[in-house]
Swiss-Prot record:
InterPro entries noted in UniProt: NA-bd_OB-fold, Primosome_PriB/ssb, ssDNA-bd
GO biological process, alphabetically ordered: DNA replication
Lineage: Bacteria, Bacillati, Bacillota, Clostridia, Eubacteriales
Compositionally biased spans, kind Polar residues: 112-129
One GO cellular component term: nucleoid
Name recorded for this polypeptide: Single-stranded DNA-binding protein
Length: 145
């Protein structure tokens, strides 16, 4: 089984490219993922390279920017290539098949616009709703178990 699920922040704006010939969108970025605190109490992070293909690649590049919180799931993949100096280079990266934007906002916006920011839209959260009014009583004699 090769499955990875990560939540972290973009270290810089995603880079969108298109493959020659087919024109398939591919976006690359580095995700900073917090680790548990070290023995001396300092917070540490791992920096994970991520690749996204297709429509998700375009959406990620268009709507995400440096510092935004993002969740991804996918697989770890290793590959190698020959560098310009003739040496063989090896790369380990996550190929994401699912991307979740945990903070919204285009590249021009500033500040956090996360899902949990109820103050920005007071209609999105109302703790005065009484959902118990919608419950219909059930005669326990009618329940088959």
């Amino acid at each position: 089984m090769n499955r990875v699920v990560l939540i972290g922040r973009l270290t810089k704006d995603p880079e969108l490219k298109f493959t020659p010939g087919t024109g398939t969108a591919v976006t690359t970025f580095v995700l900073a993922v917090d680790r548990r605190f070290s023995k001396d109490g300092k917070n540490e992070a791992d920096f994970i390279p991520v690749v996204v293909w297709g429509k998700q690649a375009e959406s990620t590049a268009n709507y995400m920017s440096k510092g935004k919180l993002i969740g991804i799931s996918g697989r770890i993949q290793t590959r190698s290539y020959e560098a310009k100096d003739g040496t063989r280079r090896y790369v380990t990266e996550v190929v994401a098949d699912e991307v979740k934007f945990l903070e919204w906002g285009n590249k021009q916006s500033s500040g956090s616009q996360g899902f949990n920011n109820f103050e920005s839209d007071p209609l999105s959260y109302n703790n005065e709703d009484n959902y118990n009014d919608d419950i219909t009583p059930v005669d326990e004699g009618e329940v088959p178990f």
